[in-house]
């Protein structure tokens, strides 16, 4: 139950009864806890239509509200705010209900939706680096949130395995080892099962090939021709390319596993290639495509969005073509309700073109919503893209090692490597996901690793503190689900209990915002606020040594609720909580 929605519906009945539009009855969490728990600001915009002062409207609404079981206090403040304080029993009962529900008050979406999530997107032959974490962590959080809310999710890594960089690699290896059978057009036998290069060598070859092509137009033309021949099915090139893909996927899977990020599909741009001819024929049959200076293009019919080039003058295909073919494939195979791309904001124009063409040509069905989660860049302390101390790109494996080092330095007596791993992951993931995805942010690992402030380790520390209370009372093998039946939250005895209860019941609000806006930072902010509320409760409300047995049980219930909410919230952003720290 989203408490904001519940209160909005309660007030909406009064608005309707008085002849006002229900849409003005929206209730939100109060921006000032000293005046109330929640507030309704609808009287201000309503005044324009009702031709009455907003203060008079607010007073009229409050006068007609009859819900003493929900509200302890309803106050009107200038120029027309309605400040709402919940009744202690309603607050306690709601917290109790959440404690005893599987998803801590969150209800499944109805009807069930099928969502395709496209994220990760590493390129073949390029090791994953710090710049890849945004798509990986944001995409993973979104698939966790969508599944939690009841959606059927299909996640696809969508490898970059079919562009000009493949031709660059082929030409560079040909230059380096021209004797390899892959380059003999007359060879008809079986190709070797072992790759002629390792993934480490591939990572060294690509920068060399890229530099050569950028500095020499003739080399770039060779690479483009090799790419074209690969896409046309030249046997030796396809066999060599298959080696590139296989060894790259093996390496990338290890990187994603280290982040606990997983995919349902491991498809790449190449998998959509077989649909391109069918799709082009469809475009031609329906007069969507036309020739322009030797290339074939499709208009977007959107102001400020240029036409999309589908086939180049030389007959090669563009990234946009492959992305359209991928949408074609997903639409036919999966028939989704929504496809979400988690790709950096520098690709915004590209996706506007692709989405516009896909919708206009009905490559996707009318029910299918296309969304680009356009995230900002990961920058260092200097405001520039994050680099190593030596000025190079920091590989993901090195970043994780550094996070583990920070964790170990702060806990030198911790000998359990799994706990160090959990702290390192919380450091990286929370440090990234606490930021609104649309913004660039400064990646400061030293700051993220602090055990105080808005950090992953602080969340873990707080959750472990709450767990330690339960372990002290019930032993190591306690089970919150079965215990919660005998331990109930009761009316708050002081402000610390009240604020903790109030924070606990806002979990569904955070989940709904994260879900609807593709913004996991709402979950992070919730978890941080919950941690703060619990720590104040912990300091000011004794539990284990309490003589009052009924009060002790009520506070134990609040500890249970905190552990449950914190565990679920942490899992939604890919963080696991240790038993001890």
Swiss-Prot record:
Provide the taxonomic classification.
Answer: Bacteria, Pseudomonadati, Pseudomonadota, Gammaproteobacteria, Thiotrichales
The question of whether Cytoplasm is a record keyword is answered with yes
Which NCBIfam families is this protein grouped with? argS (TIGR00456)
Q: Which reaction does it catalyse?
A: tRNA(Arg) + L-arginine + ATP = L-arginyl-tRNA(Arg) + AMP + diphosphate
Q: Where in the cell is it found?
A: Cytoplasm
In Swiss-Prot or TrEMBL terms, this protein is called: Arginine--tRNA ligase
- Identify the EC number(s): 6.1.1.19
An example GO biological process term is: arginyl-tRNA aminoacylation
InterPro entries given for it? aa-tRNA-synth_I_CS, Arg-tRNA-ligase, Arg-tRNA-synth_N, Arg-tRNA-synth_N_sf, ArgRS_core, DALR_anticod-bd, Rossmann-like_a/b/a_fold, tRNAsynth_Ia_anticodon-bd
The GO cellular component terms are:
cytoplasm
Q: Which family is it part of?
A: Belongs to the class-I aminoacyl-tRNA synthetase family.
Assembly and interaction partners:
Monomer.
Q: What's the chief localization of this chain?
A: cytoplasm
Top class in the EC scheme: ligase
- Give the keywords, sorted: Aminoacyl-tRNA synthetase, ATP-binding, Cytoplasm, Ligase, Nucleotide-binding, Protein biosynthesis
- CDD domains of this UniProt entry? ArgRS_core (cd00671)
**One MF term in the entry's GO annotations:** arginine-tRNA ligase activity
Position of sequence motif 'HIGH' region = 122-132
One matching Pfam family is Arg_tRNA_synt_N
